[in-house]
Amino acid sequence: ARPGCGKSSFVGNVAINMAREGYPAVIFSMEMDKEEWADRFVSQDSEIESDLLQTGKLTHARQWEAVSESVSRLADLPLYIDDSPYLTVTAVRAKVKRLLARTGSLAMVGIDYLGLMEDIGSNSGNLAFSIGKVTRALKQLARECQVPIALLCQLNRGVESRNNKRPTSADLRDSGRIEEDSDVIITLY
C-alpha cells in the first residue's frame, strides 16, 4: 500500500486479535515506537479517541475507567512490540528465536516495514538485490520456525497515476523478489 493506507493498522489488528485469542504475536516496528502502538491498542480497546488519550483530556470518570480496564486487559496479552529503529534480518532472526524459546510458539511475526530494514541498500547500491536477500532470508526464517511473517512494504508511485488504482503484485516497490518469496500478497488501497 502507499503511505497512509493503513498497513501498520492492518498488521496491528491481526496481531492483537491473535493475542486476544491466546496466540503469541510480535511486531517489529521501525516506524512507530511502543508507546504509539500502546496508544493505538488502548484507544481501539477502550473505544476512546486516540487524541483524547494523548492529551489526557478525558472528562468523564467512565472514560478513565475504560482506559484503566483496557490497559489491564492488554497488559496480559502475549503481544510483543520491538521498536528497535535499526533492524537487520539477523537481528529479527535472533529475536524471533528468543521469543520462540520463551513462549513456545508464535502465531505471527509482523515487520513494519521492508523499506526501513537496515539490510536494504547495503549491497553497493543494488536495491533489488538487497530486497531479494532480505525477503529470501525472511522466507527461510518463516519455514525454519514455522511461523507466518507479515512483511509490510510500499507500492510504486505509478499506481497513483493510473485510472484504476487497484494495486497488483507488479506494483510492489523495487523488486519482483517480494512476489517470488511471498506465499500470499495482500494489497491495501
Predicted regions and their residues:
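The conserved Walker
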Residues: P3
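Conserved lysine of the Walker
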Residues: K7
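Extended, hydrophobic alpha-helical segments in both membrane/secreted and soluble proteins
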Residues: F10-A15, W37, S130, V134, ...
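Cytosolic-facing regulatory segments adjacent to core modules
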Residues: N13, N17-S105, D119
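Conserved nucleotide-binding/hydrolysis micro-motifs of P-loop NTPases
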Residues: M32-E35, P85-T88, L114-M117, I149, ...
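Active-site glycine- and acidic-residue-rich loops that bind
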Residues: S84-K95, S124-G132, P167
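Helical hairpin unit composed of two closely spaced alpha helices linked by a short loop
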Residues: R98, L106-L151
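Phosphate-binding/switch region of NTP-binding enzymes
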Residues: F129-Y189
